């Protein structure tokens, strides 16, 4: 190991548009010597990595890129492992810590590498912002990818979210090899929700290829051409309604307050 202490940053680059990347994420990427990531994610920061050592990986090579990032940091390099959205939500930081735990990494040891998760704007944040206010009350997040989690476990989680009347954000709704999962999920929700429950389908949020559809649960499958790994689906709950093409999930103020007042009873303090 180098005498210089290496640093490993697991960086969330957000939905893909630099306007929605955090200042710290940009700063860390710019000061890093080595950039590692899935090829599509690396391409999102192409203009920030000129002249750097860059390693691009294909999908399903997560373990390889995580190990390489750790290896470079252990050699004293400053490394950014880039992840779309937020690295702590279906991202790479969990795998990094799993590997480090197996290696016996001690974060308090001054000779150990420095590791930091740099948060980013997740799909659930970016997609919700594009379609109104769908996440105002309790919500659940479920990934349809059964590559690492058995489908029967995913079904149990979907059932629990549907039965609990949670607004539900669905990541990875479909791929070339996964076509039945969202159809099955829709059937589960229809057991507990009305067919006209609002849903949103957002593909490529804040990217040039962005597509948005706000529709209803019973018509979800009419938009299967939008489904893929960069698509997020938001399923409303029993309170969600559609207004002007937006999903609105009431926070509960209507039951406690008069929302439109003829005259404000108490004036705010002016500073």
Language model: regions and residue ranges:
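Class I S-adenosyl-L-methionine
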Residues: 1-115, 223, 262
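Class I SAM-dependent methyltransferase SAM-binding "motif I" and its flanking Rossmann-like core
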Residues: 17, 91-164
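A contiguous loop/helix-start segment that scaffolds small-molecule binding in enzyme catalytic cores
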Residues: 163-271
